[in-house]
Amino acid sequence: MEQKQPLIIRDKNQMRNWSRSMRSQFKLIAFVSTMGYLHQGRLSLITEAHKHANVVAVSIYVNLGQFSPNEDLSTYPSDFEGDVQRLLFVPGGVEVVFNPKNLYDYGESGGSDGGVGGGEVVSCVEKSGLGHESWVRVEKLEKGLCGKSMSVFFRGVATIVAKLFNIVEPDVVVFGKNDY
């Protein structure tokens, strides 16, 4: 059964205001973070989110911070309109889709030296000169598993998840097995 069209929010302040509006109505907010190109596994997380909250927010954001400069970010699949259409058929629907352009963009005031010193790992974000300087590190994960071959992956994921939590301010978050 098709649901109503979700509200699309691209501005982080508007997203935060939406969440606070829901909270003022005593609604619990569940959040599912995605990079888009939604498949049945991700859609099932949204169905699960409905079991734990009154409203569901989904982010669709390709995180530059988890890609190394030598990875081809342009080949990452993207179909925003298709994703929104798929969300219409999730039982219970989705109230809001947060689709920011760039959560690392600091405008003119950000630094533009294009990287970090001392031979540290560099992601697409630093290489682009956006001036992002604060990162959330998960050192144990960075040293093992795929952390050795994907030097910025866990740092980028942990950082963006922290940013999204601070913007969306969810009561409940639903992750899948591949998110750990």
Annotate each language-model stretch with its function.
Residues 1-180:
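Nucleotidyltransferase catalytic core that binds NTPs
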